[in-house]
Amino acid sequence: MAKLIVNFSALLMIILLVSNGLPKAVAQTCFKGEAQEGVCVKVDGSKLCDLLCRATNTTWFGACEVEDNETHCHCYGPC
């Protein structure tokens, strides 16, 4: 009976640790820089922005964002 309680407690601890760590790993992204100018104003600019950032580093992604009334391609990746 004691062995069953220990095994059950160990299983619960593993589930707790795994479920607690996953959202943090996915949510942590940091600004890595800007891609080529004028990318976001073109047709399918957001796709091109994403491709340019991924070409720099495969773990990065790109997003077109407005900054100082201009649209820029910003690259983000893991911190």
Swiss-Prot record:
One of its GO terms (cellular component) is extracellular region. Keywords: Antimicrobial, Disulfide bond, Fungicide, Plant defense, Secreted, Signal. It is found in: Secreted. One of its GO terms (biological process) is killing of cells of another organism. Residues 1-27 form the signal peptide. The keyword Secreted applies. It comes from the Eukaryota. Disulfide bonds join 30-79, 40-64, 49-73, 53-75. The keyword Disulfide bond applies. Belongs to the DEFL family. This is Putative defensin-like protein 203.
